[in-house]
């Protein structure tokens, strides 16, 4: 019963704090020890942002530490919220702000952090930059993406990215293409397409659906492996894969286990976003210092590939090459050590 009461209390606090910044009134603001500045339009993506929120939620359930979430509409509003938080917490003890993704890296470089309170900190997630006044932590995608590319070598492949010139996405693209180019079958090719030229690409599921549906319809036998780096737009790709007929293509689940969203997901690239944030918050609560910058990777379990037995149970299409339920397990076992080694090489260069 006590746990249920705690859960309800936290849910009420989160609900009260999910409004615009102007609605954070004194009672909640003064109580909050942890503040999470979410990526614009990020929550509800069935992926990265939801996983991060779950990690923070598990921390507050365990510790009953007050929390609030700020969800800006765009990066301009995010900077206003960030500046206000720094002002409000300049002299407070034990106040933590988590900047939810590398989208905020330029803002973090531009806006100086001045916190005088004991134990107060700012964490920028998904960045390896060294920035005065705050800590950064990143999960490397290179090795896991390399493994996805190597396991996709029997297909033509499509890498669909939300935006151009994003360091985190570029790392995934490089990893996937390196693995694919090293192991693809003769005559198979990979292509990289972009959904948008700016950050709007993270939240364009309808555009992703139309792009994917047109691509499937343009081929009498669509057989591509899709590697989606789309954030909230990813749901559009999954929906198109479910809706379109004569589709023998597959899609790799992204960030979390997405096998329940489509029977066309043979495996997912899992990023332990929530666990990393949970562990950082536990370290903060215990008084342990955060390193200035830290990168986690496959060798530490921060990124991994999850194979989905449900793919074989639910796949009713005549996909003869998938009749052996060990198809992707064999590919995984063949390339996993190579992927870990390639990631170490990448990080050391």
Placement of each model-derived feature along the sequence:
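Hydrophobic alpha-helical segments within soluble ligand-binding/sensing domains
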Residues: 137-157, 270-286
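Hinge/cleft segment of the Venus flytrap/periplasmic-binding protein
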Residues: 279-349
């Amino acid at each position: 019963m006590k746990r249920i009461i705690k859960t309800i209390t936290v849910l009420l606090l989160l609900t009260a704090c999910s409004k615009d910044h102007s609605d954070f009134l004194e009672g909640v603001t003064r109580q909050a020890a942890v503040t999470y500045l979410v990526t614009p339009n990020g929550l509800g993506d069935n992926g990265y942002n939801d996983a991060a929120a779950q990690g923070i939620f598990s921390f507050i359930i365990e510790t009953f530490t007050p929390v609030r979430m700020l969800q800006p509409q765009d990066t301009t509003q995010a900077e206003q919220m960030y500046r206000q938080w720094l002002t409000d917490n300049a002299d407070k003890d034990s106040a933590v702000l988590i900047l939810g993704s590398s989208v905020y890296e330029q803002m973090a470089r531009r806006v100086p952090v001045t916190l005088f309170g004991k134990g107060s900190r700012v964490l920028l997630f998904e960045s390896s930059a060294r920035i005065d006044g705050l800590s950064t932590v990143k999960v490397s995608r290179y090795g896991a993406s390399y493994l996805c590319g190597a396991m996709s070598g029997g297909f033509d492949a499509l890498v669909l990215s939300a935006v151009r010139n994003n360091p985190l996405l570029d790392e995934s693209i490089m990893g996937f293409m390196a693995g694919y180019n090293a192991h693809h079958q003769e005559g198979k090719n990979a292509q990289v397409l972009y959904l948008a030229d700016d950050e709007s690409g993270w939240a364009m599921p309808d555009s992703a659906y139309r792009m994917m549906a047109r691509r499937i319809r343009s081929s009498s036998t669509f057989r591509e492996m899709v590697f989606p780096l789309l954030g909230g737009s990813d749901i559009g790709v999954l929906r198109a894969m479910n809706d379109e007929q004569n589709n023998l293509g597959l899609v790799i689940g992204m960030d979390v286990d997405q096998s329940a969203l489509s029977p066309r997901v043979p495996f997912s690239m899992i990023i332990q976003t929530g666990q990393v944030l949970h562990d950082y918050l536990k370290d903060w609560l215990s008084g342990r210092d955060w390193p200035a910058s830290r990168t986690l990777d496959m060798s530490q379990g921060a990124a991994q590939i999850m194979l989905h037995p449900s793919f074989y149970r639910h796949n009713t299409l005549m996909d003869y090459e998938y009749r052996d339920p060990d198809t992707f397990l064999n590919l995984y076992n063949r390339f996993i050590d190579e992927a870990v080694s390639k990631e170490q090489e990448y990080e050391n260069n």
